[in-house]
Curated annotation (Swiss-Prot):
InterPro entries: Aldolase_TIM, DeoC, DeoC/FbaB/LacD_aldolase, DeoC_typeI. The active site is at D89, K151, K180. Catalyzes a reversible aldol reaction between acetaldehyde and D-glyceraldehyde 3-phosphate to generate 2-deoxy-D-ribose 5-phosphate. It comes from Clostridium botulinum (strain Kyoto / Type A2). This is Deoxyribose-phosphate aldolase.
């Protein structure tokens, strides 16, 4: 697979304007990235501009804290799919996970998978807030719930992707589930290290620099 197809070209800053999003979209077309990842209010715009290409539209749900209710996340997912999203990056309920409420976490992911209507679902586990044991549990629950990917980070918390976390996540989910590294990846060397450790997708706001 060519390097560009690993990349979700990402712009999730709250101050991003329509002009910024359109620039992101044009870059994704030019460099043939896997997707653009935008906030939900920009999904329609991205869909309209990408529907005749093979660049997917990715959006976020329960972002960035993961602390909204399951019902809210399910509704967000349904609206995003209606608006044209191909991929959903949902944030796990970190507090519920850390409280040992495994069934809550698993059922929530399962409901979002169902609401996504066979679109790709990636579960952001926010590795920087978890112990090693919690990282393993988050990955296991995501896999059991039918998600397609586990993802390291929102990029809005206390840390981003680390190679050792990618390695642990890959070992936990096995070879048939996707692993997405995101947060703090700024160079091609960093991206290649993530891929070597098992990442099958890279989330980055500097996608153009990564493939130049």
């Amino acid at each position: 697979m060519k390097l560009s197809k690993y990349i979700d070209h990402t712009l999730l800053k709250p101050q991003a304007t329509e002009k910024d999003i359109l620039k992101l979209i044009e870059e994704a077309k030019t460099y043939d990235f896997a997707s653009v990842c935008v906030n939900p209010s920009w999904v329609k715009l991205a869909y309209e501009n990408l529907k005749d290409t093979d660049v997917k539209v990715c959006t976020v749900v329960g972002f960035p804290l993961g602390a909204t209710s399951t019902a809210s996340k399910v509704y967000e997912t349904k609206v995003a799919i209606e608006d044209g999203a191909d991929e959903i990056d949902m944030v796990i309920s970190v507090g519920q996970l850390k409280s040992g409420n495994d069934e809550y976490v698993k059922e929530e992911i399962k409901k979002i998978v169902e609401a996504s209507k066979n679109k790709l679902v990636k579960v952001i586990i926010e590795t920087c807030l978890l112990t090693e044991e919690e990282k393993v549990k988050a990955c296991t629950l995501s896999k059991e719930a039918g998600a397609d990917y586990v993802k390291t980070s929102t990029g809005f918390s206390t840390g981003g992707a680390k190679p050792e976390d990618i390695k642990l996540m890959r070992e936990t989910v096995g070879k048939n589930m996707g692993v997405k590294a995101s947060g703090g990846i700024h160079t091609r060397e960093e991206m290649e290290v993530m891929i070597e450790n098992g990442a099958t997708r890279i989330g980055a706001s500097c996608g153009v620099e990564l493939v130049k």
